[in-house]
């Protein structure tokens, strides 16, 4: 920036004569050599000539806007240029704010002023260099400041200036799309006509002005907070709108196919194949209720109403209940009713009867042998199973064992049978009979004696007749 740039000069409200100011110096302190009276006399003489020091220029709030930024930029740029080239500085000229031309992009919507606002330059000095001090405000400025501090005492003298302090009515937002969304081909649009400041102002009393000065800062604060909340809530919507605007018509047409697409439903039919079950669950395992549905879609409640077991031969519920009773020692289970097998039309189901008999035999085999303590001393079963002498076996081959056809009483016949098998008879025949039947049971269960009887055939008797004891 060259030294020929015109710097802002001090403009006095009462005098249009320019006063020189030294660049880079804000003010001149009062000299200690002069007394108070001399300084006051000098100030009075200078005020008579129209020279005022430390003048304060009051601007209305509506004029304190972003429109003053270009003026400040010009002022700051000139200060930097004069500081860099102080030797090239020339006498300053008077510049009016209204005569400054702003750039094309910066409009002047708030430049209407009732009073022309003057920006003062650097503080002036006296030519002789003595009694350097700051300028004092003009009497009119002092009265205006006092009226601001105590508006009741002003008696409406500055009522028009106070009306200038009131904020104009808030203009509604412009209609239509924002400038960012308009096409460049449309050309620049002229801004809508703005109403004059005087038409929007209302004549208010001093009390209303005081209340407005108090309430306006609070309203502005609330307005800013609500604007921030609206901006934060609309961020997501604005992003979505921006994303939609980035697509072309062809891309939007392609994106519509996403919603229009429908998947094809393919029904997969299960293929049933025969297989061998690898794992057979045991009794008492937890049923997972993972069942393959029947082809006829009939719910048979497997696992709920009947036991779910893989083998084809299902267990009998009565036999299972008897096994549980035999294994448990719970008194509550033992006190329940004993299960009874019920078979309808037994004459038509002989296989069910045979199965029941075989199940009962297997159940009794699994039961542990009961231990009986006899009152009298009796021989054990192993001793009674010893082989008989050879002479007795030869006699038995020719002589038949007495049958129940003997003309004797039942007690006598029992004693004869017990003596043949070498079982002593005591006071109680029940213990002796229990030992004799236990001996016969051991013979029937012994595979050795069963094979021996089948080989010898013992006079043509078969195994079926050997299992029966005739009394």
Swiss-Prot record:
Span list, region Disordered: 1-202, 226-246
Stretches with biased composition (Acidic residues): 89-99, 231-246
GO process terms (BP): cilium assembly; intraciliary transport; non-motile cilium assembly
Effects seen without this gene: Shorter and compacted dendritic endings of the amphid and phasmid neurons with an abnormal distribution of the intraflagellar transport protein osm-6 along these ciliated endings. Defective chemotaxis with 78% of mutants exhibiting reduced tracking to the chemoattractant ammonium chloride.
InterPro entries, A to Z: Intraflagellar_transp_cmplxB
Any one Pfam family match given in the protein's UniProt record, by short name: IFT46_B_C
Transmembrane segments: none
PANTHER family: INTRAFLAGELLAR TRANSPORT PROTEIN 46 HOMOLOG (PTHR13376:SF0)
This protein's name: Intraflagellar transport protein 46 homolog
Species in which this protein is naturally found: Caenorhabditis elegans
